[in-house]
């Protein structure tokens, strides 16, 4: 109930207007009761941030069935776009809002959920390079470029900026996927380059 109420207030009024008292009022608890479960609102939003990553992980569960690493990378990008467009509030907490990262700094711990997603991307990019599917390069740099590309698309879309390029709302996600296709096509190795048959 506490997390549901927090997300409702966050969506309707923004992070700055969410307080423990307002959360308590919404669910008819006393603020003291809320504090029994969460130290502060940053901790509440950190928990929501974790739930968002769990949702994204569920979307990516079938990636292991895709043997071709380039197709897997492409599907990973599509899933990212679809997740961000379907869950803008969670996306905000996971990749845009400062508060969850502030909580990580306060706790002195690693960004476990984010690191897991990033490592999966790096592993897939490295496999693509090793098997000749994409141009050889620094896998860290290529992974950062791929992530930055899809993150930029989602951020522009959920903040209402992408309409400058795509006025029709129903075309936003299809155009984002076309942009992803362009990226993948441009990092793909040319047919002339040798490719490990085992990767086909």
Per-region residue spans from a language model:
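Helix-turn-helix
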Residues: 1, 9-43, 47
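Short hydrophobic clusters on alpha-helical segments that form packing/core surfaces
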Residues: 2-10, 18, 52, 56, ...
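Hydrophobic/aromatic residues within well-ordered alpha-helical segments
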Residues: 41, 48, 52, 56, ...
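Alpha-helical DNA-contacting segments of helix-turn-helix folds
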Residues: 44-52, 94, 102
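Amphipathic alpha-helical linker/stalk segments
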Residues: 50-75, 105-106, 111-117, 122-130
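Hydrophobic alpha-helical connector segments
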Residues: 61-89, 142-146, 189, 193-200
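Short secondary-structure transition hinges
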Residues: 86-123, 141, 169-170
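Hydrophobic/aromatic-rich alpha-helical bundle segments in the mid-to-C-terminal region
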Residues: 107, 130-179, 191-200
């Amino acid at each position: 109930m506490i997390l549901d109420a927090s997300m409702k207030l966050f969506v309707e009024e923004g992070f700055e207007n969410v307080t423990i008292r307002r959360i308590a009022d919404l669910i008819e608890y006393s603020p003291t009761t809320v504090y029994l479960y969460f130290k502060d609102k940053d901790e509440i939003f950190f928990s929501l941030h974790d739930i968002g990553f769990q949702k994204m992980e569920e979307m990516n569960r079938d990636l292991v069935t895709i043997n071709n690493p380039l197709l897997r990378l492409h599907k990973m990008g599509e899933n990212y776009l679809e997740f961000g467009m379907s869950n803008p509030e969670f996306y905000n907490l996971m990749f845009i809002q400062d508060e969850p990262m502030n909580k990580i700094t306060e706790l002195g711990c690693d960004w476990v959920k984010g690191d897991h997603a990033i490592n999966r991307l790096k592993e897939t990019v490295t496999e693509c390079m090793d098997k000749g599917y994409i141009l050889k390069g620094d896998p860290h740099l290529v992974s950062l470029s791929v992530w930055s590309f899809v993150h930029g698309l989602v951020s522009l879309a959920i903040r209402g900026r992408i309409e400058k390029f795509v006025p029709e709302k129903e075309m936003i996600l299809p155009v984002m996927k076309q942009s992803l296709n362009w990226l993948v096509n441009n990092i793909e190795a040319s047919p002339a380059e040798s490719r490990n048959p085992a990767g086909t």
